[in-house]
Amino acid sequence: MIEDDGMLLNFSTDTTEDNNDSKFNSGKVTGGRWKERRKLKMMMEGREPVKRKTFEELENSDMDTNKKPKSDSSGRKSYNQQSNNESVKDVVRPVVSKVNPSQVNTQIVSSLFTAARQVETSVNINEHDDKEEINPSNAPLAADNFDSLKIEQQLVNHLNEKMRIQKPTSIQKLVLPQLLSSKNNDLFIHAQTGSGKTLAFALPILSKILSMKTRVDRKSGCFAIFITPTRELATQIYHVLSELTNCCHYLVPCLLIGGESKKSEKARLRKGCNFIIGTPGRILDHFQNTQSVKEQLAVSLRYVVLDEADKLMELGFEETLTDILKLIHDISLNTSVYPQLPSRIMHILCSATSKGSVTKLGNVALQNYKMISNSHVTNELENATVPDQLLQKIAIVPPKLRLVTLAATLDSIHRKHIEQKKKKLDYVSRTVVFLSCSDSVNFHFEAFSSSDANHRNLVGESARLLTKGNDILPSFDPENDPDFICYKLHGSLSQQIRSSTLQHFSKTNENVKGKHLVLFCTDVASRGLDLPEIGTVIELDPPFAVEDHLHRIGRTARAGKHGESLLFLLPGEEEGYMEYIKPYHTKGWKLVNYTNDLLKPSFQNVNVKRSDKETSKNVEEWDTNATTWHLNVERRVLEDSSFKDIAMKGYASHIRAYATHISKEKKFFNVKCLHLGHLAKSFALRERPKTMGLQNTKNGGEAKKNSKESAKNKMFRLARMAVKQSSGEFNY
């Protein structure tokens, strides 16, 4: 009995201990999240959770790896030391090799001045001679006047007194007698940019109408149609004709362009007009749908002018132009009403360049035409040249430095503006920056116009005046207004914004007096626009064809005035582009060193402040200031998600646009030769292009799938597309 009691006592004690152990060391903990279960199990086992160290802590711990670890009295390492050593091993492998790069912040701030591709060009193959005496090639002729060209005296007086034009240019002297003669030949006018082609064909047409003894008014019919490739150029010709017809108010021009109200245009056409100016799509639309237009053309139409003919063909208007010409030629012409006018419809083509596409259009539109050119090259009109008084500069800039070098260039121009303003308080200078695509225009406009809160919108979101305290350029005085206005212009803007922006940039009034105006734009502003007082043209992105290069730089050095142009090229293959454009620059160019000629003068001996913290130390080293300026833009990309989206769109669109160069220039502009990481740096992006793609894919993948489109929604969508297509032609 005693043994049994002892056995029961021993058994009872063992059972209690086993039960306690089983409660403490039960096999599985259930319920809750796995992290909580893991923590609970480790606590039950008397262990602490392993804390993963950051990279900084790991680097600090590496400093003590050679030190002998402390041991306890038994000579063994403590448990905490063992767990810490094990944690180091556990941390290193997963972070480096197994973590998805889109899930961690792996940004690396690369230096602006390292790992740049070596510039291969050491000698300027087409040096500009500063000592050579230059006579402007597109200037008005000093020895001639409009009286000798048999223009109506009423028009000559208006030119001299109201428009302040006394002397004709060389192309005007050649064209006016041809259009005023009785031979009635079609003409192909080929002349340099800025040489006055608009007046060359507008003056004789207007003079011919004024010479008629018959009284005319807006009900007399349409005498001439002017077709242009862009809305901006059509608007400019409309303003020129409006100014010319101020001497004969009974003659009325009419503008027909996409983006405007067709109802208002129809009303103007029904009232009557003497000149129609517009883009191909809208003109064809009215010819097909507005009956009053056809009725006016039968009696009066005598002239059809195709301005910038090469661009009309390049933009795919060949079929539209063919339809317009067919409709015009199908109209039976009645010459008895105005016998003093030509007995047939005269066709006039105008272009600063002559290519195969223009010749093709000439064969369709012209009959027995005569070529008129003021070019020195008579047998090879392909080799159009830039104005002699234009100073061309070329800078070979690594892709990482494109943005900061552009800032240095604008700063240098602004310093000159400040010096000129000391002599003349209301001095206005204008600079045009050409870029390859609209998204790139948006990025550079935002980067330079809204770096902080010190700015004010002037024309919607497309024109901004920088105000006191703005420090986007090193030359800005924080105590004074910078007198700096940024504009943007591209085909994706609405027609109203495009028109108002261009008008604000072009007009010299109290709002812009004494200010430096900078326009960021695509090639929409490269054709035919006579923008006043353009001092410098900057081609940050090379043109898609050499003809576009000639038209871009043709915005400056117009009508005999001096001007400058700066072309940015990347090191490597793009350097061969200089040899390609050499025949067009007969007076040579200056090869600019981006370090000594641009960055150092702008960033030396100035204090560029950091945007993230205030520092009392003044830094005068140019490279440090340039780096600080660029990092300020990068920090803004990190902090402002909307600006980051603009930067990423600009970067992606720039690469897509880069791949669209014409085939014969692909050897200079090969997208496979671009360093995409360095190019991303020029858009203030720190992420690698691959990481950006992963993030975009992930974001797109997480978006919910769109349900199948209903028949009703599809009908409305197609209707909206039809309305949009009919409201305007190619949105250039």
Curated annotation (Swiss-Prot):
Keywords annotated in UniProt: ATP-binding, Helicase, Hydrolase, Nucleotide-binding, Nucleus, Ribosome biogenesis, RNA-binding, rRNA processing
Protein name stated in the entry: ATP-dependent RNA helicase DBP7
Catalytic activity, reaction form: ATP + H2O = ADP + phosphate + H(+)
Places the protein is found: Nucleus, Nucleolus
UniProt-listed GO biological process terms: endonucleolytic cleavage in ITS1 upstream of 5.8S rRNA from tricistronic rRNA transcript (SSU-rRNA, 5.8S rRNA, LSU-rRNA)
EC number(s) reported in the record: 3.6.4.13
Source organism per UniProt: Vanderwaltozyma polyspora (strain ATCC 22028 / DSM 70294 / BCRC 21397 / CBS 2163 / NBRC 10782 / NRRL Y-8283 / UCD 57-17) (Kluyveromyces polysporus)
Name of the gene this protein is made from: DBP7
SMART domains linked: DEXDc (SM00487), DUF4217 (SM01178), HELICc (SM00490)
Entry text on domains: The Q motif is unique to and characteristic of the DEAD box family of RNA helicases and controls ATP binding and hydrolysis.
